[in-house]
């Protein structure tokens, strides 16, 4: 059982960290511009990263995170890995419009209602390095629309664009565990927001969103005092 940390791991651009996921799996990440973390397709069960070189082609995704995520996640500083230099934040993001409404999803033949998702999603240009007010991830602003209303025919164009949300524990932790299982970037938040069919492996992720007893036992049980 892990003890809840008193404060989040201090932020420093270029700091490489490992995060312990469930079932003893570790993943590598790097702090870039606060509050963005870059996650890499590097997983192991020993938390031993000797010989690992961080490359752009090994990036899973980049996401803004809360201090709550760093506080509740088991984080360790990794000094033996050289940080990826000159990383540029993505410029294409998904904006979820205000006016969230309950949506119904189905996993393993069971329908569940989820709250808090926008009525419409847009692919937008949001240059986080422009120096403009739109850079602030808390404000959710952007420069222009690329696709104002994403439809099924736009899914390929949207690709792996991230939503302009700020991730928390434990939804991000479960997403990373899904990336480990599949060996690639998996994005449940995008799949749910765009109305894509959901695989059975998303069951725990949905459990977290619905605050089910199963999810609380799996994740919060280790962190409650």
Pin down the residues of each PLM region.
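A eukaryote-biased signal for long
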Residues: 107-225
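Amphipathic alpha-helical interaction segments
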Residues: 48, 57, 69, 95, ...
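Short, isolated positions within intrinsically disordered regulatory regions of eukaryotic proteins
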Residues: 15, 53, 97-99, 159
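Long, low-complexity intrinsically disordered regions
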Residues: 62-128
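Short N-terminal edge-element motif at the start of the domain
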Residues: 1-64
